[in-house]
From Swiss-Prot:
Enzyme class, broadest EC rank: transferase
Origin species: Helicobacter pylori (strain Shi470)
Compartments (UniProt record): Cytoplasm
Quaternary structure note: Homodimer.
Annotated GO CC locations: cytoplasm
Role, per record: Specifically methylates the pseudouridine at position 1915 (m3Psi1915) in 23S rRNA.
Main location: cytoplasm
Protein name from the UniProt record: Ribosomal RNA large subunit methyltransferase H
Length: 150
């Protein structure tokens, strides 16, 4: 299995994420983080919400894979507990997660993904990545009946 987290960000909270990356390997899952912040995104965010969203879509579109499970983290999307999250990931070999910038996703981009919300609360990119990585590890623990998830 391969899970890739793509985000509009300049850097990742590496130390804690590295722990989850290592733990996921025991389930034969490669957990990768890819931070994207093209030059046009910084400029677009200064101009308008619409241009910012378009720049996010342009950054992410090359990574949308019709053969993979594509999941966009979106605050108004479906949410559930860790068991529901594990069911969503089960039986998929390649899973791409997308975390937009401050202005969120364009509706057109969301049509190409399953949307999922981690919480009703708003998180910084750093916290969202940590929570997502932990939940990926927890989902794998549920799928493989590992005692981490009790």
């Amino acid at each position: 299995m391969r899970c890739v987290v793509y985000s509009i960000a300049k850097s990742s909270p590496l130390e804690l994420v590295k722990i989850y990356q290592k733990q996921c390997k025991q389930f034969d899952c490669e957990l990768e983080l890819v931070d994207l912040f093209p030059k046009n995104t910084a400029n677009a965010q200064k101009v308008s919400k619409e241009l910012a969203q378009k720049s996010y879509s342009l950054a992410f579109e090359p990574y949308l894979n019709p053969k993979a499970k594509n999941i966009a983290l979106h605050p108004k999307a479906q949410r559930g507990d860790s068991f529901a999250f594990s069911k969503m990931l089960e039986n998929h070999l390649n899973i791409n997660f997308f975390i937009a910038g401050a202005y969120g996703f364009e509706e057109n981009f969301l049509k190409d993904c399953q949307a999922w919300s981690l919480s009703e609360m708003t998180f910084s990119h750093e916290v969202a990545k940590i929570v997502l990585c932990e939940q990926i590890y927890r989902a794998l623990s549920i799928i493989f009946k590992h005692p981490y998830h009790k």
